[in-house]
Swiss-Prot record:
The gene is xpo5. Residues 630-631 are annotated as: Pre-siRNA binding. One of its GO terms (cellular component) is cytoplasm. PROSITE patterns: IMPORTIN_B_NT. It comes from Dictyostelium discoideum (Social amoeba). Found in a nuclear export complex with RanGTP, exportin and pre-miRNA. This is Exportin-5. It is found in: Nucleus; Cytoplasm. PANTHER family: EXPORTIN 1/5, EXPORTIN-5.
Length: 1135
């Protein structure tokens, strides 16, 4: 080593010392960093690195030396001469030979990384003896063995699998050379792997006197075997299956799952082995060994070591078993027999699906979904297996296992898998849907068995309830069990009705071939009619079960009178005066379930309910006269009556019916007291007493006002929302007509009340918008200030918490006032929106735009995003859909520029705030991150839906108004940049809708808007490349815009010229190629080449290393539920 090299090495050591010394100042660190970076770029930098590697014992210095070599290999390898390259390769291998077990891990890892980088550039042509050298090195000690295994394990990741770094380094030819080399070497490699595994496993399992091992040596042997299993994972997916079978690795994996130290590695290799690509017959060959060793799988889950380690293994082996069974079923046909030990396998899968862990049990659902769909399986015990599945689904459907409630076995596992109740709740909701999917499949294929199963279960529960009628109240878990039974009963009966042939005969007593179905149904219904409980949750269960039997009532209409005799008396269910708040809430739920069940039944079988209309009407009137129902229940009862009135034969009859109910309501609505209260924020605040402190002893008049205004507005809302056109209107001189392309059978009876109702609705809407202004909010008493916040019943589910009224800490008056404000706003928006839907009454107003701007579209700067979402959804969309073409310019021109500008500014500001928050790493409170962001997504989605509607409904207007098009395009561009999957997906659809089939976008006034703003926005999204799955869609938008504009304006070219590597000559050549290219496919190829090869935007989707890299919770959604003819290989399920 010459003196110059020694001098530089000493300088490097000093610079590193200063860089890592906490006492160094910033200037010293900066100078050291600059010097060290300059060293890496020197032509003879490798000589310093080799000098350090061969002489120094300083770990930091050696690590920097390896960095020097890594920089050279990655950036200047092909600039080095042969002598320099050979020297570096020799020193790397020498270092590998000398390295000891005490060497820091970061040096070992860096050494392996460098070696693989050199291999990628020189092997096999310029390093033919590499593999021999590595295998010889591995014999030196266990340390060298581990390094060699790590090298072999890392190599395929950069060659076989396409990663971002590899795609930039390796040419296609280089990749082919490496593939050829590794394929030639794979047989000898696997011989080495096998011999090493055999040797080390024998040493672990059967140490001889000559090889007696210490605990530390045993630990090292275990470690080496696990490193080898990790290395095998890099090959097991793609090497020829013959190589695996020749070395009996499939059998070895099945054996190793019985050894606690190796079971996880063996299981992960099995997952990759079973997920190999191949033809059906090849895949059938893969599964033979695991089925033959099924006893090992069964025994492996009985081994107890450490609770969490055991559980982790159980999750992995469940994934392996699921893939095993799914591969078999997807390749199954008449040529293949049922595998050996299939009964043991199904026993295991039943055990796994009934496991207390919601996550683990969810892993097997894809298998059972596929299993049920394969109807050709010939198993003598098939019916019994299906019954056990249904039994399990019924048990698992009960919502138990919250990790923050550690009183159950399910919760113990949830604590491991889920950090919060929110995470668990979201996951449970998705899995619960999958339970219903499986029940649906079983019902479609075996409807009699499915019904008998659930009806028997319900009957048994009812028998138990009948024997214990004196129970004061049910526990929360008992209530959940009842809810699961009624829910699944409803699901099965609904599936029988909608998805099975001749469902109308299912409950036909004369044609049903299984008399036990009729007998069982009679037993269930008799119990439901007989039981009279004072416990509200039991009564709710009865109501839910009775509502589920709509199919039975269709076939046996004589039972309807018994149904009504049971449910109608339950409407005023007693118990609202109970001091227990939880009991009160259950009573309210029961009363409302009774009414909603009547609404549901009447809606579904309205023709059979007609004879009972008078009886029901008299019952409702009697309930009103006795004043035994609340205001909310009155509105629900009005809904019930509307369902009946929608079937009245004539317009006049319907109108007279409405007048009988609405006349007193409208009288209150137009009264001087009410009109004054709705006219301004000050009057509204005074009328509702919003400036008065919250108190439990409020003035009765004030309480009455609050209840009454909500009752009146809700009644008007329900009539506008649920009423329909009488089917025979045309018989009474109301001829069918068409408005804006929509065909109407006749006149809407409810629209006769527009002139009376609308002024108050518009006045109230304006007042509500003003109420959110700071100067008016300041007039609200501080004790009521939270009425402007979202209610816990809305935020709790968004945050993943269960909501229970009895856990609410705020005053009931505050909650009620908040509900009043929300109810009034919803009522106003829906009355106006449905008014647009009720033909032409509103559109006949001569000053409609001014009326709307002065009311529903006034003070928009004050309202919140959640209100803006409702306004767009309930008013703007209906206005756009129903506006007559001849009035579009008159109505839209004053309104849409203002409204679209507001929406654009809200959307842009909202997504920029989220982006800024993520860049700064700020952690705001959970409500801001979840609730507000969720509302912003909803606003963005409603805006995009609105854009889609107006492009479809009013293309002539939208392309004639730059004042509307400008904020609309800017808004769509903001949604494109939102980096949110659903929003981006919808934005791409709307963008395509805007550009395709509308030649008017070629108007010069849109050139900059679309050719620059939207085009540039799409380029930015590609560069960020966070959503590889949308890459092709974004490229299509880019191509569409460019093809429309590149010959008539310069805006798209200006965007491209601002990007790296794009010069005027390159762009001119590109345009010339486009002119000569006519096919869309060829255009796509040109654009992809320009974007990827010239500009350097990474367009290729990156492949996951393996299915093992998927988060466990995504596993269930990645296993396919498709039938075998639609799936070619299991690997596709995880891409």
């Amino acid at each position: 080593m010459n003196n110059d090299i020694i001098l530089v090495v000493n300088q490097i050591e000093q610079a590193l010392s200063l860089l890592h010394d906490p006492k160094s100042n910033n200037k010293q660190r900066e100078e050291s960093q600059v010097f060290l970076e300059e060293i890496k770029t020197r032509a003879n930098a490798h000589s310093y690195a080799i000098a350090i590697i061969t002489t120094s014992n300083n770990d930091i210095l050696k690590h920097f030396a390896l960095h020097i070599i890594e920089t050279l290999v990655k950036n200047r390898w092909y600039e080095c001469n042969d002598q320099e390259r050979e020297l570096i390769k020799k020193e790397i291998l020498e270092l590998m030979r000398r390295i000891t077990s005490n060497e820091p891990k970061f040096i070992k890892e860096k050494l392996v990384t460098i070696l693989v980088d050199v291999i990628k550039r020189d092997w096999p042509q310029r390093w033919m003896n590499l593999l021999t050298s590595l295998i010889e090195i591995s014999k030196i000690s266990d340390t060298q063995t581990e390094l060699v295994l790590s090298t072999f394990g890392l190599l395929p990741h950069d060659i076989i699998f396409d990663t971002g770094s590899t795609s930039q380094v390796l040419s296609d030819q280089r990749r082919k050379d490496l593939m050829a080399g590794i394929n030639l070497a794979v047989t000898s490699l696997f011989e080495y792997f096998y011999q090493l595994l055999e040797s080390k496993y024998t040493q672990y399992k059967q140490p001889t006197p000559a090889t007696t091992t210490t605990p530390q040596q045993t630990k090292q042997v275990i470690h080496l075997i696990n490193v080898l299993l990790t290395t095998l994972r890099s090959y097991i997916e793609w090497v020829p299956s013959k190589v695996i079978f020749d070395h009996k690795l499939d059998q070895i994996f099945c054996q190793l799952i019985l050894d606690v130290p190796f079971r996880m590695g063996a299981c992960e290799n099995l997952i990759l082995f079973l997920g190999r690509k191949g033809r059906p017959d090849e895949r059938i060959e893969l599964i033979q060994t695991p089925f033959n060793f099924m006893e090992n799988f069964l025994n492996s889950i009985k081994i107890n070591s450490d609770f969490e380690d055991d559980y982790s293994f159980h999750k992995r082996i469940t994934q392996a078993l699921t893939i095993l069974g799914t591969v078999h079923l997807n390749a199954y046909d008449d040529k293949h027999k049922i595998p050996n030990n299939y009964n043991i396998y199904l026993q295991l899968m039943l055990q796994m699906v009934s496991h207390p862990s919601i996550l683990l049990s969810s892993f097997v659902l894809p298998f059972w979904h596929t299993f049920i769909k394969v109807e050709s399986l010939e198993l003598s015990y098939l019916e019994e297996v299906i019954k056990q599945i249904m039994e399990t689904m019924l048990v698992k459907f009960v919502r138990i296992g919250d990790p923050e409630k550690s009183d159950s076995e399910q919760s113990k596992y949830s604590e491991i898998d889920f950090g919060t109740s929110k995470e668990w709740s979201n996951f449970f909701g998705g899995v619960r849907t999958r339970y219903l999917d499986i029940i649906k499949l079983i019902t479609i294929q075996r409807r009699e068995m499915a019904y008998i199963f659930i009806a028997t279960k319900v009957a048994d529960v009812l028998d138990a309830l009948k024997a214990n009628l004196n129970v004061a109240s049910l526990s929360h878990e008992q209530t959940l069990v009842l809810e699961s039974h009624s829910h699944i009963l409803d699901s099965i009966l609904l599936n029988i009705k909608d998805f099975t042939p001749e469902s109308s005969l299912f409950f036909n007593k004369e044609q049903q071939q299984q008399p036990n179905i009729i007998q069982l149904t009679d037993r269930v219904l008799n119990l439901l009619f007989e039981i009279n409980s004072t416990e509200p949750n039991i009564t709710s269960f009865q109501i839910d079960c009775l509502q589920a039997y709509i199919l039975y009532y269709q076939t046996n209409p004589e039972s309807i009178k018994f149904l009504l005799n049971k449910i109608v008396p339950l409407i005023p269910f007693p118990g609202l005066d109970n001091p227990n708040r939880s009991f009160q809430n259950s009573v309210l739920h029961t009363r409302r379930r009774a009414i909603s069940s009547l609404i549901g039944i009447s809606t579904n079988i309205s023709h059979l309910m007609k004879p009972y209309f008078d009886i029901l009407y008299k019952s409702v009137v009697e309930l009103f006269q006795k004043n035994v129902v609340t205001e909310t229940e009155k509105v629900m009862l009005f809904h019930l009556l509307i369902v009946f009135s929608n079937n009245l034969p004539s317009y006049q009859q319907t109108l007279d019916f409405y007048k009988g109910i609405l006349t007193p309501i409208i009288e209150q609505w137009v009264s001087l007291e009410m009109s004054t209260a709705l006219s301004s924020p000050d009057a509204f605040i005074q009328y509702l007493g919003l400036s008065i402190a919250d108190s439990q002893n409020l003035d009765a008049t004030l309480v009455s006002r609050r209840k009454n205004i909500q009752y009146v507005a809700s009644t008007l809302q329900i009539f506008w929302k649920k009423s329909q056109i009488p089917t025979n209107s045309s018989d009474e001189l109301f001829a069918p007509f068409i408005s804006n392309g929509i065909s109407y059978n006749g006149k809407w009876p409810i629209s006769s009340f527009v002139k009376q109702v609308l002024p108050g609705v518009l006045s109230l809407t304006r007042t509500l918008h003003q109420l959110w202004m700071p100067e008016h909010r300041a007039k609200i008493h501080p004790s009521l200030s939270t009425i402007f916040n979202l209610d816990d019943s809305i935020t709790a589910p968004l945050l993943g918490f269960e909501y229970h009224k009895e856990q609410k800490s705020e005053s009931s008056n505050v909650t009620f006032l908040r509900n009043i404000l929300d109810c009034l706003r919803d009522a106003c928006y829906e009355i106006v929106g449905y008014g647009f839907n009720h033909s032409d009454e509103l559109f006949s107003l001569p000053d409609l735009p001014l009326v709307l701007l002065d009311s529903v579209f006034s003070y928009l700067e004050s309202i919140e995003n959640r209100h803006l979402k409702l306004l767009v959804k309930h008013i703007l969309n209906y206005l756009i859909k129903n506006c007559p073409t001849k009035l579009e310019h008159t109505i839209f021109e004053p309104i849409l520029p203002l409204l679209f500008s507001v929406l654009f500014n809200r959307i842009k500001a909202g997504w920029e705030l989220i982006k800024l928050r993520s860049q700064k790493g700020e952690k705001e409170n959970e409500k801001n991150e979840i609730v507000e962001d969720k509302i912003l997504r909803d606003v963005s989605m409603e805006f995009l839906m609105c854009c889609s509607n107006i492009i479809t409904q009013s293309p002539n207007y939208i392309f004639s108004s730059i004042d509307v098009m400008t904020p609309m395009v800017y808004g769509i561009s903001s949604c494109l940049m939102a980096m949110d999957t659903p929003i981006l997906k919808k934005s791409l659809i709307v963008s395509t809708q805007l550009l395709v089939d509308h030649e008017k976008v070629n108007d010069p006034k849109f050139f900059k808007l679309i050719g620059s703003e939207m085009f540039g926005c799409c380029i930015k999204i590609l560069i960020v490349n966070k959503f590889a799955e949308f890459s092709n869609d974004i490229q299509s938008i880019i191509r569409l815009i460019y093809m429309k504009y590149y010959q008539i304006c310069n805006y798209p070219q200006e965007i491209l010229l601002s990007l790296p590597n794009i010069t005027p000559p390159i762009l001119q050549a590109f345009n010339k190629d486009l002119i000569s290219t006519r096919s869309e496919k060829s255009q796509k190829v040109l654009f992809k080449k320009l974007l990827q090869d010239v500009i350097g935007i990474p367009l290729n989707k990156l492949k996951k290393e393996s299915i093992l890299d998927l988060p466990e919770k995504l596993f269930i959604s990645k296993i396919s539920d498709q039938s075998n003819e639609n799936i070619s290989n299991i690997s596709n399920l995880f891409n």
